[in-house]
Structures are given as C-alpha cells and as structure tokens.
C-alpha cells in the first residue's frame, strides 16, 4: 500500500502589525509649514503703479513693467510673470487698462485717461453743489409761476371791470335824452325871473304913452271941421 500524500497547508497572508500601524497614522500629525508673509503688494497694484510712474505716451510694455517691479519691489519677476500676464488680460477685458499695441499679454498697456477719471470724480461734487442751488431755484420758479398765475386772475378781473365801465359809458348816452326831457322843467322855473325883468324895463310903457298922445290931436281936429 502506498503511503498517503502529506497535506500541504495553504499559506494565508496575514497583515503584519507594523503595516497596520503605518496605515493608521493620521496625516494631520505632520506639522504644517507656515506661509511666508508677502513682502510686496498685490500684482494688480504693482502693475498699475508701474504704468503710472513710467508715464509712456504709447503705453508701457510687459518688459518695462517687469523691470520696474524688479527694481521697485525687488520681486522675482520670473515667478510672477504668469500672474502679471493674467492681470493684464483681465484688466484689458474689464476696461481697467488700454492695450495700445499687440494682443493678449504682449504689447503695450496704458491707463484709460486717469486725468479724466479724476475730473469726473470732481465734477460729481460740483454737480451735487450745483444741484442744491437748482433745487432752491425751482421753488423760486414755482413761486414766480404762482405769482404769474395770481397776476393772470387780476388781469382777468381788470378786464372784467373794464367791460362794465364801457357798458356804463354807453348807459349815460341813453340817459342823455332823459336829461333833455328834464331840461324843460328848469326852463319853466326861470320864466318868473323873465317876468320880473319886463317890470324893470320902461321902454314898452313909453311906447304905449306916445300912441295915445298922437290920437288926442286927431280928435281935436275933427270938431274944428264941424264948426265950418
């Protein structure tokens, strides 16, 4: 008889305790590196300051801006180059900068009429100061309008008063005949005065005395004819 084959024990991998410990270690246990404080202002501020100080008519190029940043802020321009280009593109699209030459981040850049912005900032103050007198002037105009409105009714009343005056002038013209009718009454009153005047005049009496004197001699002549 053949001997039975020996049983082979199956090898089962068992995790070592050392590996388990490594996996359980939290990552937060590592100390974080403290961020170094910035020794320069933001890229946008530096670029705007560079363009302002350079004051180039045709605009400042990217190379000129980099040179200014390296000299003024002592910054590693090669590391900041992508940030500078990104800001230039965004500023052009937003209208914060004008690109006089080139396309994208290459070319020359200029501020959009900084002097005009200052003037515009000053003019709103003046406008605000001017609006106050205008607001004060509006009530004056309103008062003038009210006065004119008040004057118009006065003129209307004056015209209304004038019309009745014209009518009253016409009425006296119609009353004149009534005055003429009343005139004969005073004429009748002076008649007694005229009667007194003939009493004072002696002339009519003298004429009456002469006529009978002439008749008397005629009567004397007639009896003389009878005697013959």
UniProtKB/Swiss-Prot annotation:
Keywords: Chromosome, DNA-binding, Nucleus. Residues 148-170, 178-209 have a biased composition (Basic residues). InterPro entries: H1/H5 (IPR005819), Histone_H1/H5_H15 (IPR005818), WH-like_DNA-bd_sf (IPR036388), WH_DNA-bd_sf (IPR036390). Residues 39-113 form the H15 domain. One of its GO terms (cellular component) is nucleosome. Signal peptide: none annotated. SMART domains: H15. Residues 1-18 have a biased composition (Low complexity). GO terms for biological process: chromosome condensation; negative regulation of DNA recombination; nucleosome assembly. It is found in: Nucleus; Chromosome. Histones H1 are necessary for the condensation of nucleosome chains into higher-order structures. Belongs to the histone H1/H5 family. This is Histone H1-III. It comes from Glyptotendipes barbipes. The lineage of its organism: Eukaryota, Metazoa, Ecdysozoa, Arthropoda, Hexapoda.
């Amino acid at each position: 008889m053949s001997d039975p084959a020996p049983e082979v024990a199956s090898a089962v991998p068992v995790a070592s305790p050392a590996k388990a410990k490594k996996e359980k270690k939290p990552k937060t246990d590592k100390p974080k590196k403290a961020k170094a404080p910035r020794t320069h202002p933001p890229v946008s501020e530096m670029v705007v300051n560079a363009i302002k100080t350079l004051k180039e008519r045709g605009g400042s190029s990217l190379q000129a801006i980099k040179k200014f940043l390296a000299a003024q802020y002592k910054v590693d321009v090669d590391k900041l180059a992508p940030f500078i280009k990104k800001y230039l593109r965004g500023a052009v699209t937003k209208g914060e900068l004008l690109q006089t030459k080139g396309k994208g981040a290459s070319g020359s850049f200029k501020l959009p009429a900084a002097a005009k912005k200052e003037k515009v900032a000053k003019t709103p103050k003046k406008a605000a100061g001017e609006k106050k007198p205008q607001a004060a002037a509006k009530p004056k105009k309103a008062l003038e309008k009210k006065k004119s409105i008040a004057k118009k009714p006065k003129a209307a009343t004056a015209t209304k008063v004038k019309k009745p005056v014209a009518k009253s002038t016409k009425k006296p013209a119609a009353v004149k005949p009534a005055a003429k009718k009343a005139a004969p009454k005073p004429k009748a009153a002076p008649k007694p005065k005229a009667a007194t005047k003939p009493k004072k005049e002696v002339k009519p009496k003298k004429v009456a005395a002469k006529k009978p004197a002439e008749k008397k001699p005629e009567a004397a002549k007639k009896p003389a004819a009878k005697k013959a």
